[in-house]
């Protein structure tokens, strides 16, 4: 019979006094069994970190009780170890010394030999035996977070609290640390509470998932039991019916309680009939020899990348980052580009934007060669570049005033307000950028890009800095606005689900250097799309599996064998054949 190690009974927490009190958590109740792995899923600002701080004894609740082994939590204790999102290491100490510092403080009554063995065991457990003598400044972000995990584990707590420990890491490093946490939880049989905003991470690691509703007055929603056998593998889970059902149920619940992409009632019902300056392109005309080819490209390839190559000089000689990138896009097509870090995705995008010179080949947009930046292209970067002292409206107006020089002030105002309302900022258009969350800033960036009426919209991991639940919301916003404009678009992403949701085709890049297109997947899913609808579509997980297998083949800088790539192509052909057959049956 399992023993209850932690009890939360009607816990309340807020900040401030009287009428200025900001209620954060309300009526939080939960029982955690010894050895259980709990994942708490929640939106940014819902109070997840506040909750973890109370469990660690760093904050006290305003009401209710938190009981650890039947005793009220009054303050911090080595029995409850915590790892925060931002690792706090002693920069002058080595990996070994950082872990030893915690061991010596908690296990001071143990013999020195036993303490040293504890340090060695946990440094090795997180895969840092080879780096034990390095300082934090010599470690990657993922390695530093491993030190934090090792330090917490070496204290041998009864309860390990993990407050979004992997959210700041790149996808590949995050996946590796997820595997290590899963392995540790099984070896140590430790009771673990993980705060995350990643549904797949929660399902991969947890025995039970507890969603936290959006604040203020956030509370726990219904829990979801994860009845999937361990060890769990991402590729295998993708085709597991239990995983598919659970993932859909959790996603649907979270979207129902917190994600809304519904546009606000707009003051501007229709855009004014004004012509952007981008229709008078400043790109240089094609040489005569290319004109016939360019005319064909306009019909079948509105955008054409022709043998595009990028070479950077290095002390060791020229380094070819992108080697012969070839792609044709139809007008109004949405392309996602996906691949591992360093594969040249952003380099391709920056060349299309005219921000990075091309060493060989060329890019044609609407019959003209791209030779530099221009108003016919708009870019949304990962970090929105806004003037912090200007309001949302003023930030968007900067570009609109330049792109529509012949429009009246009222017409330009209508364009700005139309797109700000489309991205859900109708009530915040007069708020300075400095007072906005990252999600709100990115909404301004999206509104600004669409307001320029570009021929080509370029999105460079536009949601990469946001938590996954905020990403869902902005993906829906992006889809809603794009469906109105049908602008030709390229989106660089490392998120498989995002790539499928947005794109008509997904371009998969091989590893760099000398990166090139490894595969192109056509996404034959109905539009308009929503995350909810896609999760129920019979072909969705087949697309997902194809992308995951491609990324897995190139994981860690690997060069996959031809047999491995052939197997991926064979599955793709089988999927296409099945889809064709299903369409034929439906037509009959």
Region locations from a protein language model:
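Conserved ABC ATPase signature
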Residues: 135-139, 143, 432-436, 440
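Short helical segment in ABC ATPase nucleotide-binding domains corresponding to the A-loop/adjacent helical element
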Residues: 84, 96-104, 116, 393-401, ...
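The feature captures the beta-strand-to-loop junction immediately N-terminal to the Walker
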Residues: 41-43, 338-340
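Helix-to-loop junction immediately C-terminal to a conserved catalytic motif
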Residues: 56, 353
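Conserved ABC ATPase "signature" region
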Residues: 112-131, 183, 409-428, 480
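Conserved signature/switch motifs of ABC ATPase nucleotide-binding domains
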Residues: 134, 155, 431, 452
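Conserved ABC transporter NBD signature motif
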Residues: 64-75, 361-372
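A short, flexible loop at the N-terminus of ABC-type nucleotide-binding domains that lies
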Residues: 2-5, 14-27, 294-302, 311-324, ...
């Amino acid at each position: 019979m399992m023993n209850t190690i932690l009890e939360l009974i009607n816990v309340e927490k807020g900040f401030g006094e009287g009428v200025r009190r900001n209620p954060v958590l309300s009526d939080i109740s939960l029982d955690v069994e010894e050895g259980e792995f709990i994942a708490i899923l929640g939106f940014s600002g819902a109070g997840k970190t506040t909750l973890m701080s109370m469990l660690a004894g760093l904050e006290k609740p305003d009401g209710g009780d938190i009981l650890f082994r039947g005793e009220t939590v009054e303050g911090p204790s080595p029995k409850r170890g915590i790892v925060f999102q931002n690792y706090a290491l002693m920069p002058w100490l080595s990996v070994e010394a950082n872990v030893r510092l915690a061991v010596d403080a908690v296990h001071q009554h143990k013999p020195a030999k036993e303490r040293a063995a504890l340090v060695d065991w946990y440094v090795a457990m997180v895969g840092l035996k080879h780096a034990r003598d390095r300082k934090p400044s010599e470690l990657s972000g993922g390695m530093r977070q491993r030190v934090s995990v090792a330090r917490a584990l070496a204290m041998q707590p009864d309860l390990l609290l993990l407050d979004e420990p992997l959210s700041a890491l790149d996808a590949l490093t995050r996946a590796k640390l997820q595997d290590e946490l899963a392995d540790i939880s099984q070896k140590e049989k430790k009771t673990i509470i993980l705060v995350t905003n990643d549904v797949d991470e929660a399902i991969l690691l947890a025995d039970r998932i507890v969603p936290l509703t959006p604040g203020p007055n956030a509370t726990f929603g219904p829990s979801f039991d994860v009845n999937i056998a361990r060890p769990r593998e991402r590729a295998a889970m993708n085709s597991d019916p239990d995983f598919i059902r659970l993932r859909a149920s959790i996603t649907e619940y979270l979207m129902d309680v917190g994600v809304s992409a519904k546009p606000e009632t707009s003051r501007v019902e229709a855009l004014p009939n004004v012509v952007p300056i981008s229709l008078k392109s400043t790109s240089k005309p094609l040489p005569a020899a290319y004109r016939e080819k360019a005319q064909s490209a306009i019909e079948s390839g509105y955008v054409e990348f022709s043998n595009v190559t990028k070479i950077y000089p290095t002390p060791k000689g020229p380094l070819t980052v992108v080697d012969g990138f070839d792609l044709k896009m139809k007008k109004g097509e949405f392309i996602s580009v996906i691949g591992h870090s360093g594969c040249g995705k952003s380099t391709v995008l920056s060349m299309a934007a005219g921000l990075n010179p091309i060493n060989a080949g060329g890019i044609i947009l609407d019959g003209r060669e791209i030779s530099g930046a221009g108003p016919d292209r708009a870019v949304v970067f990962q970090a929105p570049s806004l003037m912090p002292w200007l309001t949302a409206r003023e930030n968007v107006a900067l570009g609109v005033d330049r792109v529509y020089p012949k429009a009246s002030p009222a017409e330009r105002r209508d364009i700005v307000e139309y797109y700000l309302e489309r991205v859900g900022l109708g009530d915040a258009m007069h708020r300075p950028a400095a007072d906005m969350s990252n999600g709100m800033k990115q909404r301004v960036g999206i509104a600004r890009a669409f307001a320029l009426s570009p021929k080509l919209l370029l999105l460079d991991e536009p949601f990469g800095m946001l938590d996954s639940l905020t990403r869902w919301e902005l993906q829906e916003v992006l889809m809603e606005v794009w469906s109105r404009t049908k602008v030709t678009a390229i989106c660089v992403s490392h998120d498989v689900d995002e790539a499928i949701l947005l794109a008509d085709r997904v371009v998969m890049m091989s590893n760099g250097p000398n990166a090139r297109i490894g595969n192109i997947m056509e996404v034959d899913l109905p539009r308009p799309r929503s995350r909810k609808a896609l999760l129920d579509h019979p072909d969705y997980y087949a697309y997902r599996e194809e992308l995951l297998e491609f990324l897995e083949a190139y994981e860690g800088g690997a060069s996959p064998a031809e047999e491995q790539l052939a197997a991926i192509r064979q599955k793709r052909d089988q999927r296409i054949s099945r889809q064709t057959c299903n369409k034929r049956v439906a037509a009959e």
